[in-house]
């Protein structure tokens, strides 16, 4: 376990960040209808999108690829214009409670650009279907099918120096949950199903897990930014799941046994003011109990989704932590 700073008793944030958090929370709360649906028309008023850009900006260009137009399954490829061969590939799943946002939402477009530039890596950000219009297991199906499409078409998608044998999954919040569950599916597949894609690491940034029993963090961190029991309960209901479902409470009473799977080494990121932190720590402990390699990185003075705010020093620190993890996993292949 590693901690990047000493804990404070109170969350202290820059004014810019506080304003952004207030706007995001107000927007999502007002979009959620009492009947469990979402006012998408209202959201579109605030959901600014970044178009793909084939011209490099800060050495990174972007392009979009359609997997299945009928279900709006596509991904954005972030290409770092750097020298060298065998550049890793990071498959990224965005957060948003399974119900909000997309790869071309400005916050996630910016995050993936930073990943591509700083690691460096080819980043593939998957657009999956959203709840409540599309319930479980649509999001996991889309993640798996996107990987299968990359496996079968990588020659026409990725440049020659992109090395799919150095493939990582990454995701934050709901995206961390999707990354975990899609990784299990891939590990269960026959080896002949994925010959190009070799999953060697998973970067789980404040993954969205839960359970029927409330944790101490859920009880104590009332009023924390973005996340509350009411909001998370709404998201699980939108997915059509109870909170002890195997996809929600991954180490709980209905947990999937991964002890016999070649599950990738995992980096789990936790923040001190995130009401989900106990579930994330439990995930880390469960991975270890299953005999899997895992590392826990803690930011005691941060909140849920802190890393999408580039003005925070911890956001930059996390990018470098992720780079270290990627470099160490790649180096282990030749050790």
UniProtKB/Swiss-Prot annotation:
Function: Carboxylesterase acting on esters with varying acyl chain length.
Modification N-acetylalanine occurs at: 2
Name this protein carries in UniProt: Probable carboxylesterase 18
Record's keyword annotation contains Hydrolase: yes
A GO term for molecular function: carboxylic ester hydrolase activity
Organism superkingdom: Eukaryota
Xref: InterPro entries: AB_hydrolase_3 (IPR013094), AB_hydrolase_fold (IPR029058), Carboxylest/Gibb_receptor (IPR050466)
SUPFAM superfamilies listed in its UniProt record: alpha/beta-Hydrolases (SSF53474)
Enzyme class of the recorded protein, top EC level: hydrolase
Organism name: Arabidopsis thaliana (Mouse-ear cress)
Family: Belongs to the 'GDXG' lipolytic enzyme family.
UniProt tissue specificity: Expressed in roots, flowers and siliques.
GO biological process: pollen tube growth
UniProt-annotated catalytic positions: 173, 274, 304
EC number of the protein: 3.1.1.1
Keyword tags: Acetylation, Hydrolase, Serine esterase
Motif (Involved in the stabilization of the negatively charged intermediate by the formation of the oxyanion hole): 94-96
A Pfam family: Abhydrolase_3
Catalytic activity as recorded in UniProt: a carboxylic ester + H2O = an alcohol + a carboxylate + H(+)
């Amino acid at each position: 376990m590693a901690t990047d700073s000493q804990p404070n008793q109170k969350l202290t944030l820059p004014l810019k960040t506080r304003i952004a958090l207030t706007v995001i929370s107000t927007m999502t709360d007002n979009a959620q209808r009492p009947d469990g649906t979402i006012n998408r028309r209202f959201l579109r008023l605030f959901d600014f999108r970044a178009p793909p850009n084939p011209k490099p900006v800060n050495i990174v260009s972007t392009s979009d690829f359609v997997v299945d137009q009928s279900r709006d399954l596509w991904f954005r490829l972030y290409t770092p214009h750097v020298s060298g061969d065998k550049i890793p590939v990071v498959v990224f799943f965005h957060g948003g409670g399974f119900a909000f946002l997309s790869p071309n939402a400005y916050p996630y477009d910016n995050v993936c650009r930073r990943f591509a530039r700083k690691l460096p890596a080819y980043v593939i950000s998957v657009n999956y279907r959203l709840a409540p219009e599309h319930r479980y297991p649509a999001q996991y199906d889309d993640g798996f099918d996107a990987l299968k499409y990359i496996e079968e078409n990588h020659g026409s998608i990725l440049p020659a120096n992109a090395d799919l044998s150095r493939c990582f999954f990454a995701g934050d919040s709901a995206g961390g949950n999707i990354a975990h569950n899609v990784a299990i599916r891939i590990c269960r597949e026959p080896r002949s199903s994925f010959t190009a894609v070799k999953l060697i690491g998973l970067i789980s940034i404040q993954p969205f897990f839960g359970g029927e029993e409330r944790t101490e963090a859920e009880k104590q961190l009332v009023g924390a930014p973005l996340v509350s029991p009411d909001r998370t309960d709404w998201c699980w209901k939108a997915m059509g799941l109870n909170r002890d479902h195997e996809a929600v409470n991954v180490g709980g009473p209905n947990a999937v046994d991964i002890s016999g799977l070649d599950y990738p080494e995992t980096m789990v990121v936790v923040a001190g003011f995130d009401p989900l932190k106990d579930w994330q720590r439990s995930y880390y402990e469960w991975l270890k109990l299953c005999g899997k390699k895992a590392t826990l990185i803690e930011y005691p003075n941060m909140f849920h989704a802190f890393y999408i705010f580039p003005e925070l020093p911890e956001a930059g620190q996390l990018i470098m932590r992720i780079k270290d993890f990627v470099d160490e996993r790649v180096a282990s292949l030749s050790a």
